[in-house]
Amino acid sequence: MSSTAMVSGDDSLEPTLQSLLDQKTLRWVFVGGKGGVGKTTTSCSLAIQLAKVRKSVLLISTDPAHNLSDAFGQKFGKEARLVDGFDNLSAMEIDPNGSIQDLLSTGGDQADDPMAGLGLGGMMQDLAFSIPGVDEAMSFAEVLKQVKSLSYEVIVFDTAPTGHTLRFLQFPTVLEKALAKLSQLSSQFGPMLNSILGARGGLPGGQNLDEILSKMESLRETIGEVNAQFKDADLTTFVCVCIAEFLSLYETERMIQELTSYQIDTHCIVVNQLLFPGKDSSCEQCKARRKMQKKYLNEIEDLYEDFNVVRMPMLVEEVRGKEKLEKFSDMLVNPYVPPEE
């Protein structure tokens, strides 16, 4: 591996995620990859390591499969709750396909909540729906609501498989456009709408259009702030998870290209499920698979010489529960030493 400017005070890039633990400014960490490559195990394990060096860590799953509950053997939901056995690691699971109606609700008791109580009424809701991607994007507001009200030092996202991941990262931009469009329409037709709504008894929850607009503007500012943070390499990074196979490597390369186009930093790759048969092993299948894996591992190292590439072994047992996750997480910072081949 060649040296790069990304590493300070060292001649080579460590095959670990230690650099993420040392980066004290880091606030947002996305973990993503193709389905079935150990993405959730990696994100849970990274969150465990971060909890050792940070005051408070929030792990969020945006994968509809919601594997966090399975990984820790504990039920998580839409509200952040502490992971059993930790006093500074919390987790939550949100549905990225959450309906816009859940968030653009009808005011009432929630009228003071800029995200849950926008109270837009039928016409404004139709306008919101007309903006591509806004239905999915609105669930991002749920994340912002949690993050804003609870001050976590670092947030780890266990994202959905590759395609969904990148869509999720576009959500702040989609929402900014949606809210800007609604603000523009409302400023043009606001007085007329207010008089029509006044004649009909106003919007649900007794709000007027100006109140709704100010709530939307406050939401837009929050989204803009988060969007800027996502593009700041001091605050945000993306950890790619893959296995040493052609399709997974192809997906990883595509993902890295897209992340670069979104100006999102990525400099760590975790390669899971590697076989390390000993030199006395009689398993021909293991040796053949290892040969194939070495080929793709060499490609990964050639393509990403300025990345921290972490090599994780194929394990005999499933990584589930606090103890096994802690063991796995240790290998993210202390490289696994394979037997001699």
UniProtKB/Swiss-Prot annotation:
Q: Which GO terms describe its molecular function?
A: ATP binding; ATP hydrolysis activity; metal ion binding
A Gene Ontology biological process noted in the UniProt record is: tail-anchored membrane protein insertion into ER membrane
InterPro entries cross-referenced by the UniProt entry:
Anion-transp_ATPase-like_dom, ATPase_ArsA/GET3, ATPase_ArsA/GET3_euk, P-loop_NTPase
Q: What is its main location?
A: cytoplasm
Give the EC number.
3.6.-.-
Q: Mind listing the UniProt keywords for this protein, alphabetically? A: ATP-binding, Cytoplasm, Endoplasmic reticulum, Hydrolase, Metal-binding, Nucleotide-binding, Transport, Zinc
User: Which residues are named in the active-site annotation?
Assistant: D63
Q: Where does Zn(2+) bind?
A: C283, C286
NCBIfam families per record: GET3_arsA_TRC40
Quote the subunit structure annotation. Homodimer.
Q: What does this protein do?
A: ATPase required for the post-translational delivery of tail-anchored (TA) proteins to the endoplasmic reticulum. Recognizes and selectively binds the transmembrane domain of TA proteins in the cytosol. This complex then targets to the endoplasmic reticulum by membrane-bound receptors, where the tail-anchored protein is released for insertion. This process is regulated by ATP binding and hydrolysis. ATP binding drives the homodimer towards the closed dimer state, facilitating recognition of newly synthesized TA membrane proteins. ATP hydrolysis is required for insertion.
Q: Report the PANTHER family cross-referenced here.
A: ARSENICAL PUMP-DRIVING ATPASE ARSENITE-TRANSLOCATING ATPASE, ATPASE GET3
Question: What is the name listed in the Swiss-Prot or TrEMBL entry for this protein?
Answer: ATPase GET3
Protein's organism: Ajellomyces capsulatus (strain G186AR / H82 / ATCC MYA-2454 / RMSCC 2432)
